[in-house]
Amino acid sequence: MPERFSPEWIAVLDEAARAVIGVEDFVIQQVITDDQDTAWHVMLSSGPTRVRPGRAEAPDVTFTQDRATAEAIACGELSAGSALTNGRLIVQGATARLAKQREVLARLDAALAAAGVDA
């Protein structure tokens, strides 16, 4: 498996995510702030889900955190809720619409797990 958050890792996510069909267009952006700005975005739609490198033109929701926080959340050492509460994770955008994507995001999580992707 490629190094987490690398361009190769994003490509593996994209390949696995294509099996998931969304309901509506919705873009979720992830930004990791450190010495280098790492970003990717998940594009949900009525077609295959895509994961693309870089920042989206118009994300619906953006999650911003430093690399240590992103790693801790990904490894299960820190919950997103705790990171939000202590200010280590910042969420901006249409959070009410994000909540409506719960079912699609659960399918995406299952597809990534089935493909052995450590997201």
Task: Put a short name on every predicted segment.
Residues M1-A119:
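Feature captures hydrophobic
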